[in-house]
């Protein structure tokens, strides 16, 4: 009975899991997939604020994809595969931008994804933030406490959760009187 439950729960998960990346193709035995993190200078900006240049990495490479012609009626599964060079490990860093001339909003915090490692992964795969080493680094540098920030503001920091890439928090905040810098 327990074996049926285990097979019933694990087998569908294994079938739905993305296939492993392909490093070689039989048609091109002399070519290999490659994917690496390249150093870049990224400019972080916000309307009405001074932009900052930071060091980051971008994923660059050539991963395999292929599509074998189908038949109708279909006699076998469609043979389509797609890998893309994308972040395999990243962390989030707070970048504070100064907004001179804006008394109500003197600073804006931006969360920036810092790429640590890249690899060939399934194209349709959503960026997985589960199991990633998430550490928010503030202005005080690596010695500062994860999830803390030297300026008080209304938006929460991602203590153990990573914000969704589509909508990272970057809302402006108001400096309180008497707050320490």
From Swiss-Prot:
Could you say which residues form the signal peptide? 1-16
**Disulfide linkage:** 35-85, 49-99, 59-118, 63-120, 82-123
Q: Name one GO molecular function term.
A: BMP binding
Which tissues is this chain's protein expressed in? Most abundant in normal lung and meningioma.
Q: Which portions of the sequence form the region Disordered?
A: 132-181
* Cellular compartments per GO CC: extracellular space
Compartment annotation:
Secreted
Top-rank taxon: Eukaryota
- Give the record's keywords alphabetically: Disulfide bond, Secreted, Signal, Tumor suppressor
Alphabetical GO biological process terms: determination of dorsal identity; negative regulation of BMP signaling pathway; negative regulation of monocyte chemotaxis; nervous system development; neuron projection morphogenesis; positive regulation of neuron differentiation; sequestering of BMP from receptor via BMP binding; sequestering of BMP in extracellular matrix
Q: Which Pfam families match?
A: DAN
Q: Where is the CTCK domain?
A: 35-124
Role, per record: Possible candidate as a tumor suppressor gene of neuroblastoma. May play an important role in preventing cells from entering the final stage (G1/S) of the transformation process.
Q: PANTHER family of this UniProt entry?
A: GREMLIN 1, NEUROBLASTOMA SUPPRESSOR OF TUMORIGENICITY 1
The family annotation for this protein states:
Belongs to the DAN family.
Assembly mode: Homodimer.
In its UniProt entry, what is this protein called? Neuroblastoma suppressor of tumorigenicity 1
Lineage of the organism: Eukaryota, Metazoa, Chordata, Craniata, Vertebrata
Which gene does this sequence derive from? NBL1
């Amino acid at each position: 009975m327990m074996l049926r439950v285990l097979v019933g729960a694990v087998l569908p998960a294994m079938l739905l899991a993305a296939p492993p990346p392909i490093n070689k193709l039989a048609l091109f035995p002399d070519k290999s997939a490659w994917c690496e993190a390249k150093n870049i200078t990224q400019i972080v900006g916000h309307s009405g604020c001074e932009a900052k240049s930071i060091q980051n990495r971008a994923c660059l490479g050539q991963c395999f994809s292929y599509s074998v012609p189908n038949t109708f009626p279909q006699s076998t599964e469609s043979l389509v595969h797609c890998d893309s060079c994308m972040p395999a490990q990243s962390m989030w860093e707070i970048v504070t931008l100064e907004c001179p001339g804006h008394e109500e909003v003197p600073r804006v915090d931006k969360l920036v994804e810092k790429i640590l490692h890249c690899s060939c992964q399934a194209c349709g795969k959503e960026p997985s933030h589960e199991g990633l080493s998430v550490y928010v680094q503030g202005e005080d540098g690596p010695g500062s406490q994860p999830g803390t920030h030297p300026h008080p503001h209304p938006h929460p920091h991602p203590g153990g959760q990573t914000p969704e890439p589509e909508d990272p928090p970057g809302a402006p905040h108001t400096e309180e009187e008497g707050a320490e810098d």
